[in-house]
Amino acid sequence: MAPAIFGQGKNAPTVDELVSKNIEAKGGAGALRALQSLRLTGKLLVNQGQIELAYVQMKKRPGEVRTEGTLQGMTQIEAYDGKEGWKISPFQGRKDPEKMSADDVKSLMEDAEIDGPLVDWKAKGSVVDYLGTEDVDGTPAYKVKVVRKNGDVSYVYLDPDHFLEIRILTQRTKHGAYEEVETDLGDYEKAAGVFVATSIESGRKGAPDKQRVIIDKVEANGPVDDKIFHCPTASK
């Protein structure tokens, strides 16, 4: 049951109320501001869980991210330094860093958000609307539409009791084709006073084979060298 205070009809929540509840649920504005970097370590499961990669993701304000997946001595990397994205794809036979296209970088820019899509949405230039409740695997979640400055649209589903994100459905145009990516979030754990999802399952909406990230360790505000986010010079 949704809390009576935020029932449908005239007592429906406003966007500002939901965002405020989301910030409070994450640990509060002060704790969020104090969280300057995150290092998430765990495993990445692909191919319906048959293949397991060692997983590391590092995020640093104001908008840097680096994600690594390692298997049999090879490490794939995707990174964004706040301006441009790059990748190393050894599993596709490409061991030199390559610049990523503007379309490919969009998902990295969103990954880089330590706070998620709702916090500081006005400052980010987003447009946010509350669309009522919608069922998410049996939970009557609050559905919030976020139109980002780059044109991407994310539907953010908030748990009605805890006000944390449980699903984000993002729609974007990538290389001329429309795509929908669904990400389910759960198993929140606290780091430096902020709740962080440690179970992340994502893939194209409706696809049977989604990749799953299980985080075993969350480290907050540790030393992070800015160099790791910048594209190294490709070897000639």
Language model: regions and residue ranges:
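Hydrophobic h-region of N-terminal signal peptides that target proteins for export
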Residues: 1-7
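Gly/Pro-enriched, hydrophobic low-complexity segments
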Residues: 7, 74, 137-233
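N-terminal mature ectodomain segment of secretory-pathway/periplasmic proteins
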Residues: 16-93, 123-135
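Intrinsically disordered, low-complexity boundary segments flanking structured domains
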Residues: 24-31, 113-118, 202
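Short amphipathic beta-strand/extended segments with alternating polar/hydrophobic composition
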Residues: 53-58, 78-82, 96-105, 158, ...
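Acidic/charged, solvent-exposed loop-and-adjacent secondary-structure segments enriched in E/D, K/R, S/T
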Residues: 86-115
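Short, conserved active-site entrance elements at the starts or edges of catalytic domains
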Residues: 107-143, 164-167
